[in-house]
Amino acid sequence: LDWEFNTGEYLKSSVVVSGGTAFVGSETGIVFAISIENGKEVWRYKTSLGIDAPPLVHNGVLYVGSTDGFLYALNQEKGELIWKYETNGEIMGAANQAVRPKSNDSVLVVGSYDNFVHCISAKTGKMVWTFETQNYVNGVPTIYDDKFVVFGGCDSVLYVVGLEDGKLIRSVEVEAPIAASVSVSEGIGYVGNMDRAVMAFDLESGEIAWNYRQKNFPYFSSPAVTSTHVLIGGRDKGLHCINRISGKQDWRFSARGRIDSSPVVAHEKVIFGSMDGKLYILTLKDGKEVASYEVGEPISSTPAVLDGRILVSCEDGNIYSFISEPGK
């Protein structure tokens, strides 16, 4: 352990790192900026309600959604408000940034509990388009091929819409609500649902490539995809490694608590937190435990992994920075 920073707040938001600073939001609506070097606070900014979503940093601006329904744009260095955009529902997932293919303007795409996905100008904070679903949108919309937005929501449908204009291109029934984000690689979308299934979809045809089912439990974790594997945490306390081609299980690791944390793959290792209060590091090849760090309180957030360092926020309000050897 290199350092820990106590926010004094309940934390569900994941830590995001940019330019030597770590950013995280708290359940009372405070955005903290913390120096990675020494774990000291750089600035803080207060929104009016809680923050569950991880921030997004792009071009010196921090974008963060709040349960007050606003997406805030803050100056990354000083934490000063640039603009805020109002949706009519809680924002529970991070925004994503993209450049529209024809208009060539930088936009943010974010889901809300008002049942809409909103596309917003990064510069002005004004609406570009909205797309209506039939229920809450929880996860981060995924940008695919620089022209499509892929997301699922609580209406049990996976959507592909045009980034330029927000028009529906394809929709696929996925049998149960989706709480997390869709991971896209080489034209295939991978997602876990609330009814024990992890699915792979061909985004061109909308056909299901495979459907991985275990016993009855939901997935709140977003999958990590490598060239050969799909990795996802489950409420069965398992980290599932699925063969990307066949959809069959390659291995499964058992933790002592459920895994809502989305795994991160780095240096042939898989890193994730569990509600058992541990941060785990496994080998990607066979799921053997390399190391684990006991923090003692539930971890539902996704770790931030950068050069020899792992940062993770914990529900007890602490942010922990662990030094790991490069390549380990």
Where are these regions (language model features)?
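Short loop/turn segments that connect beta-strands within beta-propeller blades
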Residues: 35-39, 75-78, 121-124, 162-166, ...
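Repeat-blade elements of multi-bladed beta-propeller folds
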Residues: 8-32, 45-72, 85, 89-118, ...
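C-terminal structured "cap/appendage" subdomains that terminate the fold
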Residues: 271, 279-284, 288-291
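Intrinsic disorder/low-complexity signal
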Residues: 1, 104, 145, 164, ...
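A short beta-strand motif characteristic of beta-propeller blades
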Residues: 1-5, 40-45, 80-85, 126-131, ...
